[in-house]
Design a protein with these regions (language model features):
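Bacterial Sec-dependent N-terminal signal peptides
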Residues: 1-13
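A flexible loop/linker signature enriched in serine peptidases of the S9 family
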Residues: 11-16, 20, 41-42, 60-66, ...
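Short, C-terminally biased terminal segments at protein or domain edges
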Residues: 28-31
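Beta-strand-rich domains and repeat architectures in extracellular enzymes and scaffolds
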Residues: 33-66
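Blade-terminus and WD-like Trp-Asp/Gly-His loop motifs, strongest in beta-propeller folds
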Residues: 49-55, 88-96, 133-141, 185-193, ...
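Periplasmic/extracellular electron-transfer cofactor-ligation site
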Residues: 69
Length: 329
């Protein structure tokens, strides 16, 4: 009897001594976390997305996620707190939003309802972390950039596909080395192609002091039908952050022109391309841009307007008239 009691006591003691599981969102009283309130009408490096019906914008600001009407106005916070959460993307039917979050201890892809409720972690990587997710047109899968490193910390990316129920994922692209990045995935509305940016600077490794007016990044297109990849655009000034219009005819992207980062349009039918806005914030082509060379932007459903972040503001541009509209928040 005394032996049985001793074993039971030891089990209770071991159970009591088990440390509590770490929760990024609730680190405990000793963290001395203090919330702060402020009002602003501008933000830094804001990723954004437009809902499929063109009525709502989702954007991130300082690691929190907000939504607001396409006309602007008071933004509604749908994800706040200690976790750093960015890169919201509406699902094709407009009922869900995917985003990158470190709430699970490292950057992974999560999905929530458009009001911020019922947030769920989709990917559960604890080493090869993920960001920049984009939905497939059927709404059943997410494709994201997975980060790989070796002896040098800069690392490189690969494109991986995950079902919205989770799982270990499916590799779509293979990194050519461990230092030149692949990033910024975007899927055509017909689901035939995956566009992404790739560091193709000569040398085969990450370098400082690269010349952005030569070519650092190019935009590649991966075919889901045959698995082949082709270069769509690049050249002097490079090309990054590919964003395809809903009708699949136009590709918006970022190019460096001398000292300016410029928003360009590429006609996917003719190959013609031209600049439409030359006052973007400086892109990160020369840097180690793990979250992308420029923040996410998006097309309006009408195929003639783009909504993007620049100079602290959310702007809308008509690609034909070049008329700019400020969307206040």
């Amino acid at each position: 009897l005394s032996i049985t009691l001793s074993i039971q006591a030891q089990k209770k003691k071991d159970k009591k001594e088990e440390p509590p599981k770490w929760d990024v969102a609730n680190p405990g009283d000793d963290f001395n976390y203090k919330p702060h309130s402020f009002t602003t009408n501008e933000g830094t490096w804001m990723n954004l997305d437009v809902s499929p019906n063109g009525q709502t914008i989702a954007f991130d600001l300082l690691g929190d996620i907000y939504t607001m009407p396409i006309t602007g106005g008071k933004a509604k916070a749908i994800r706040t707190g200690i976790p750093f959460e960015i890169q919201p993307r509406f699902s094709p039917n407009g009922t869900k939003i995917s985003f990158t979050s470190d709430a699970g201890g490292g950057d992974n892809i999560w999905v929530m309802n458009v009001d911020g409720s019922d947030a769920k972690q989709i990917t559960k990587e604890d080493f090869r972390l993920l960001n920049n997710a984009i939905w497939t047109p059927d709404g059943n899968y997410l494709i994201a950039r997975k980060h790989f490193t070796s002896r040098r910390s800069v690392g490189a990316g690969e494109m991986w596909q995950y079902h919205i129920t989770g799982g270990s994922g499916l590799q779509l692209t293979k990194r050519k080395n461990d230092q030149q990045d692949v990033n910024e995935p975007f899927i055509s509305a017909d689901g035939k192609y995956l566009y992404y940016s790739e560091d193709i600077y000569p040398g085969g490794y990450f370098q400082y002091n690269k010349d952005p007016n030569k070519q650092i990044y190019a935009i590649q297109r991966y075919s889901f039908e045959d698995g082949k990849t082709e270069t769509i655009t690049g050249g002097p000034g490079g090309a990054a952050r590919p964003t395809v219009s809903p009708d699949g005819k136009m590709l918006a992207f970022v190019k460096r022109v001398r000292t300016k980062s410029v928003l360009y349009i590429h006609n996917l039918e003719t190959g013609e391309e031209w600049p439409i806005y030359d006052s973007l914030n400086k892109d990160q082509q020369e840097a180690w841009a793990i979250f992308g060379v420029y923040p996410n932007f998006d097309w309006m459903p009408n195929n003639t307007e783009l909504v993007f972040w620049s100079g602290g503001k959310i702007l809308k541009i008509n690609i034909n008239t070049l008329a700019i509209t400020n969307i206040p928040f």
